Structure formats: C-alpha cells, structure tokens
Curated annotation (Swiss-Prot):
Organism classification: Eukaryota, Metazoa, Chordata, Craniata, Vertebrata
Positions of disulphide bridges: C32-C88
Keywords carried by this UniProt record: Adaptive immunity, Cell membrane, Disulfide bond, Glycoprotein, Immunity, Immunoglobulin domain, Membrane, Receptor, T cell receptor, Transmembrane, Transmembrane helix
A GO term, aspect molecular function: transmembrane signaling receptor activity
Full protein name: T cell receptor gamma constant 2
Transmembrane segments: 155-177
Glycan attachment points: N66, N120, N136, N142, N151
One biological process term in Gene Ontology: immune response
Domain Ig-like: 10-104
Pfam families attached to this UniProt entry: C1-set
InterPro entries attached to this UniProt entry: Ig-like_dom (IPR007110), Ig-like_dom_sf (IPR036179), Ig-like_fold (IPR013783), Ig_C1-set (IPR003597), TRG_var/const_region (IPR051117)
Gene Ontology, cellular component aspect: external side of plasma membrane; gamma-delta T cell receptor complex; plasma membrane
Complex and partners: Gamma-delta TR is a heterodimer composed of a gamma and delta chain; disulfide-linked. The gamma-delta TR is associated with the transmembrane signaling CD3 coreceptor proteins following the stoichiometry: a single gamma-delta TR heterodimer associates with one CD3D-CD3E heterodimer, one CD3G-CD3E heterodimer and one CD247 homodimer forming a stable octameric structure. Upon activation, gamma-delta TR complex associates with FCER1G to initiate intracellular signaling.
Length: 189
C-alpha cells in the first residue's frame, strides 16, 4: 500500500514526432507516457493550445508497475497541425491542488533549415547557406540504408565463413579419425 505523504501523481514523459515520420507519413504522432501514479483511475484527453475542442486520440491500457501504475496516450495530427501547440490534459485524484495536469507539446517545425559545413564554400564566415531539408533528409535516409546494407552484408559474409570453417573442421576430423583407425588395426605408420 502507498503512503499518503508520497507523491503518487502522474509523472509525464513526452515524445515528439520524428522527422522521418513527418516527411514520410505527412503527419506526426505526439506520445505522452504517464508513470508512477496511484490509484489506477485516470482520464486523459488532448486539445490544441488555444481551443477547448477535444481531439481524437488513442490510449494504451493502464499497467501496474510495482506499487504504481503507468499509461500512455498518443495523438496523431496531420501535417497542417504540426505547427500548432498541443496539450495533453490529465485528470487524476492525486494531481497537485486537485487541478488537471496540462502537458504542453511544442509545435514542430516542418521546414528545418540545415547547414552542411563540407558544402559551405563561402569565403565570408557570416554567410548562411540554406539547403532543402528534403535533400538533406534523403541523404540521411540513404546513408542509413547504406549502413544497414553494409551491416547485413558483413553479417552474411561472417556467417558463410563460419559455416565454411565448420565444414572444413568436419572433413579434417573425419580424415584424421580414419587415419587413426587405419593405423590402430595393427599397422604402423
């Protein structure tokens, strides 16, 4: 049983949409993980920052962890809404001062400007070069795919060499056992 003086209000951890998700899916998923609360009765809903309209979201099951509980909720928004602030509103009996907890999710910039120093041929240190984020993201995705392909190739090469060594070991062992068996039948080598 929990002591009454222990803080058993929900402790939030937030996860923001990834760049890959926003580029590929044209949407973003905000995830709110609520942990270490007691009792297990909790209400969660989502709203845009300056709106009272409740947005459609999903929730996982409430799970028991040691003496407390945890639950997660997520909101998927279209690309047009990524530049707006969103709120995850949590109602729980042990919230501080009995007030609903409001967890703010910051807006996501969809047009990120990056500067790649190896392509910066400017002589003036104050010049800023902007690159198309789609090109930069594609380069990162290609690098990731190349790394994955290299690792997979190395794995299968290692596996093939290991298999070859096992077969070689089996053949040599058979040859040595036959030679030993032949030598032990009364003939000397």
């Amino acid at each position: 049983d929990k002591q009454l003086d222990a803080d058993v209000s929900p402790k939030p951890t937030i996860f923001l949409p990834s760049i890959a998700e926003t580029k590929l899916q044209k949407a973003g998923t905000y995830l709110c993980l609520l942990e270490k609360f007691f009792p297990d009765i909790i209400k969660i809903h989502w709203q845009e920052k300056k709106s009272n309209t409740i947005l459609g979201s999903q929730e996982g099951n409430t799970m028991k962890t040691n003496d407390t509980y945890m639950k997660f909720s997520w909101l998927t928004v279209p690309e047009e809404s990524l530049d707006k602030e969103h709120r995850c509103i949590v109602r729980h009996e042990n919230n501080k001062n009995g007030i609903d907890q409001e967890i703010i999710f910051p807006p996501i910039k969809t047009d990120v400007t990056t500067v790649d120093p190896k392509y910066n041929y400017s002589k003036d240190a104050n010049d800023v070069i902007t690159m198309d984020p789609k090109d930069n993201w594609s380069k990162d995705a290609n690098d990731t795919l190349l790394l994955q392909l290299t690792n997979t190739s190395a794995y299968y090469t290692y596996l093939l060499l290991l298999l070859k060594s096992v077969v070689y070991f089996a053949i040599i062992t058979c040859c040595l056992l036959r030679r030993t068996a032949f030598c032990c039948n009364g003939e000397k080598s």
